[in-house]
Structure formats: C-alpha cells, structure tokens
Amino acid sequence: MSDYSAHFLIRGKDVSQHAADYLSGLLGTYRRKNLECIHGDIPESNYQALQQFVSDSPWSQDKLMIQVAGEVNGILGGKPHSALLIDESCFVKKGDHSVGVQRQFCGRLGKKENCQRGVLACLGLGEKASLVDFRLFLPEWWAQSPERCEKAQIPREQRQHRSKLELALDMVKTAQARGLQFSWVLADSAYGCSNEFCADVEKLGLYYMMDASMKACVWDADPRPSLPAPSAKRGRPHTVW
C-alpha cells in the first residue's frame, strides 16, 4: 500500500491504513464483505474510522486507477499481442440500498438475482491480465429516481443511465487517452453481437476479437455485389393504360 499512500492523504490526514484494512477485509475469510464482517476479520481495525473512510472520505478513485493502469501498462502493454479485455461481473446483494442494485441476470450464478452489475477492463498479455478500469452499471429506474441517487450519494455527473456497451466503449477510449498501449480489444458475445460496438472499436484504429452468437452469419471474404446475368426469356408485355 505504500506506493499508493499519497492518494489517501486527505486534508493533511493519512488514512491509508484504513484503506489497507478495508482491502485486507475484502480479501479475507468472511463470505460477506460488509463492514461488520471486515472488522471481524481484521480485529485491529477501527470500525468507526473504517465506516467514515468507506462512506465519506473524498479520495479519488480515478487518480488511483490511473496510477494502477500506468504500472500495469509498463508490464503488459506495448507488445504485439497486448489486448484490452472487456467483461462483466455481478455482485450479489441482500438489500436494495447499494448503488445500481436490482433483480437482474447474474452471469456468475446463471440466473436472475438481486445484484449489482459492473463492466470491467483489464490489460492482458498471454496468460496475464490486470484490472485497469471499471464502471458500475446504473439501471434506468435508478437514474429516474433523484431521491434514491441522492441517498446513495451518487455524484451528480454520474446519475444517468448508460448501456453496458456505452460503458465498455468509454473505457476503451479512456484507456487510449491514458496512454495504455494495446492493439486488440477482446470481449464475449454480449459485445461481439453488437455491430455498432465492433465498428466503433475499429474506428479507434484497433483490432478486435469477440465471441459471436451461434446463429450469426459472417462473410469469409469481402462481399462484392454483382448484377444478375440477363435472362434469355422475354419479359412480360407492356400494359397499356
């Protein structure tokens, strides 16, 4: 954590230990990852300070991820087969207060469940990959409820519904803007079946390799339309009106 402690210096106060405790709790033995379980797993942590850190501490997630992405790029980026991997993940929840939670399909469980959904971007090379960006999906009915968004403390500029395809494309553009070096974008059929998404990736000067539906029709060569050969038979006689 020492390499990232500068991100947790808030108004002259160092809260990096709370960040370390929270991270240790997320990686801990308890299945549930609420603050009570995290505090139980990390008994030396300060519960009240940990709650303050998670709820109100104004450290910048974006600045932290920029540093993480830059370090990952130095290891996995800039190679001929460096690729940006797009995928989704679900986080099962019990209540209805977590940002973006609703009953929706959870790919991890293969069924509908009360959960959050996120779109993730990883920089990969061969068998190695590391997270460089992520977006939390905000369902439309959440975006249409200012009171719910206010209660959940969602920043005003993020209180809009965007499709997962839009979130993914935004992360591809952000990765390029941050200087990450990759030539390929990889994703599953949720993205590969969108002609618009594939075309937008190609417009960014990138190659893509994505899963497609079993029913998808593709050309194995550039199709060239041609005129049909003229028929030897004479057409229908003209009709006089």
Task: Identify the residue ranges that each predicted region occupies.
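Basic, short loop/linker segments at the boundary and entry of helix-turn-helix/winged-helix-like folds
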Residues: M1-A20, E147, K151, P155
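Electropositive nucleic-acid engagement tracts
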Residues: H7-Y22, L26, Y30-D96, F197, ...
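Short, charged/polar micro-motifs that form catalytic or ligand-binding hotspots
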Residues: S24-G28, G40, G107-K111, Q158-H161, ...
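Electropositive, glycine- and tryptophan-enriched low-complexity nucleic-acid-binding patches
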Residues: Q48-F53, R108-F182
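Active-site-proximal, Lys/Arg-enriched surface segment
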Residues: S55-L138, E150
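Solvent-exposed, flexible loop/coil residues
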Residues: F105, L109, E140-W142, N195, ...
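An internal, acidic/charged active-site-proximal segment
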Residues: E147-W241
